[in-house]
């Protein structure tokens, strides 16, 4: 574990500990006290002095990277070069160029790299997508993800760290729209930005797809808790509430994700979320950002 981020302690460490095919070996953090606390809480046998010590540990087969977005590429590439497989938090990189470089590093090293989009593994999300069926391809998709955030010290509000609503939660809305409709041929977008930092606080995007479908996407750090996905089809309208963070109800998508990742590592097979998929998602995020003009 490279880093002791909130999501690691809240979800990923328990998922690995409960998984059928993984175990926790080592953790490092810029905050040693935080690392020691997490190690104690989750029975991690080793607290490393720094990230490089984790990467030098022969007992470590794979690393999970929950670092801020601006550090994803550096530590993914260093981990791959050290012979470790990598499960990296979303978004994979700061832009498509970074994602492409990370994918090349994975191919060059012969080690697996997967983006940690845990919502893709939840049975209720998979059932929603499968239930639409090939003959019920949506005419229109609406996806939203918002929550209130105002603490200026939060990394999500710091542009140099890859902050902003689009990369943090908008990546989910783009992912689900592409999952249902394919790749867009037209992208329009607008954003509300924080005047002091320039970080995008709310983003609206309209996408048109080559198959004729459309999508309206919205993400925000200014709203009350809000997330949903709706698919309008010729046979009806289907909606799913809390599609992106439905933890432990009763399935744990984080555990399903880490088990799938470990299965791919051990079988030397492509991961459930391929690098081509992750790069394509970053390209659409880049197009939205270009339209936002920030």
What do the predicted segments below correspond to?
Residues 1-42, 262, 294:
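N-terminal Rossmann-like dinucleotide-binding module
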Residues 8, 48, 88, 113-115, ...:
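Hydrophobic residues in well-ordered beta-strands that form the structural core
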Residues 42-105:
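Beta-loop-alpha module in the N-terminal Rossmann-like domain of NAD(P)-dependent dehydrogenases
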Residues 62-64, 210, 260-294:
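C-terminal helix-rich "cap/oligomerization" subdomain common to oxidoreductases
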Residues 100-118, 136-143:
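Rossmann-fold dehydrogenase core element
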Residues 119-188, 195:
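Predominantly a Rossmann-like dinucleotide-binding segment in NAD(P)-dependent oxidoreductases
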Residues 175-244, 259-265:
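Contiguous beta-strand/loop segments that form the cofactor/metal-binding neighborhood of enzyme cores
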């Amino acid at each position: 574990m490279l880093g002791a981020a909130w999501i690691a302690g809240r979800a990923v460490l328990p998922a690995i500990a409960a998984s059928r095919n993984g175990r926790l070996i080592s953790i490092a953090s810029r905050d040693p006290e935080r690392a020691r606390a997490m190690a104690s809480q989750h029975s991690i046998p080793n607290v490393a002095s720094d990230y490089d010590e984790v990467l030098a540990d022969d007992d470590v087969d794979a690393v999970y990277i929950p670092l801020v977005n601006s550090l994803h590429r550096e530590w993914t590439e260093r981990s791959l070069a050290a012979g470790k497989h990598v499960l990296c938090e979303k978004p994979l990189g700061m832009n498509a160029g970074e994602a492409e470089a990370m994918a090349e590093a994975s191919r060059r090293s012969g080690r697996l790299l997967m983006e940690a989009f845990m919502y893709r593994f939840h049975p209720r999300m998979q059932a929603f997508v499968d239930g639409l069926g090939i003959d019920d391809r949506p005419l229109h998709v609406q996806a939203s993800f918002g929550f209130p955030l105002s603490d200026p010290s939060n990394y999500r509000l710091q542009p140099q760290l890859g902050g902003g609503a689009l990369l943090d939660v908008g990546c989910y809305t783009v992912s689900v729209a592409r999952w249902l409709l394919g790749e867009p041929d037209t992208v329009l977008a607008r954003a509300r930005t924080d005047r002091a930092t320039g970080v995008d606080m709310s983003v609206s995007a309209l996408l048109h797809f080559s198959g004729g479908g459309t999508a309206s996407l919205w993400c925000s750090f200014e709203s009350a808790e809000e997330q949903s996905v709706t698919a309008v089809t010729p046979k009806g309208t289907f909606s799913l509430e809390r599609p992106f963070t439905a933890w432990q109800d009763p399935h744990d998508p984080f555990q399903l994700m880490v088990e799938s990742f470990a299965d791919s590592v051990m079988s030397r097979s492509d991961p459930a979320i391929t690098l081509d998929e992750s790069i394509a998602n970053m390209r659409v995020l880049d197009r939205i950002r270009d339209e936002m003009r920030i």
